[in-house]
Amino acid sequence: TMAEWFVEGLVKRLAGWGDWSGDPVARKLYEHAVFYVVPNMNPDGSVRGNLRTNAAGANLNREWLAPDPERSPEVFAVREAIHANGCDMFFDIHGDEALPYVFVAGSEMLPSFTEHQLREQQAFIEAFKQASPDFQDRYGYEASKYKEDALKLASKYIGHTFGCLSLTLEMPFKDNANLPDERVGWNGERSAALGAA
């Protein structure tokens, strides 16, 4: 999936594989951070062709407030690990079927969202726009899209619980309208390049 390709690009850069051998950015990051990466949150969905649900029928991005070990063991295990280790920054990588753009959705609709989180979010957005021409912040979700069930979503739950920068990154399914490629559209290589950015 596009999220797995994104993570592949991220991991290759962090690990210094291939073209990223000896990457000074990755080396500097390792001086200050520990990374926990889940390369595929929904292996059932990947195998079965489900966009959001596991084999039990649970929409894994609506289970974060109260995951059930039987219905959503993936969320339960990852959430427990995050609570055990803490979290300073969280990214939930997705694809959006409708919007043909690369964008992030934050947690600014939550009453607990702080000025510090806003500054971190704005800094990330500006830095990522510089790192990848595929990323933009003009088009995306309205901040009011998730209100009632916001804490059921991974990035909203983590942002609220840990008070950290917590974003959902969305990629297009077909092509990026801001930087279209008529030959290949949006594909695994572009997802991986975005992850490496």
Feature locations, PLM:
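Active-site/substrate-binding loop(s) of hydrolase catalytic cores
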Residues: 1-151, 156-184
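His/Asp/Glu-rich mid-to-C-terminal helical/loop segments that flank catalytic regions of hydrolases
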Residues: 178-197
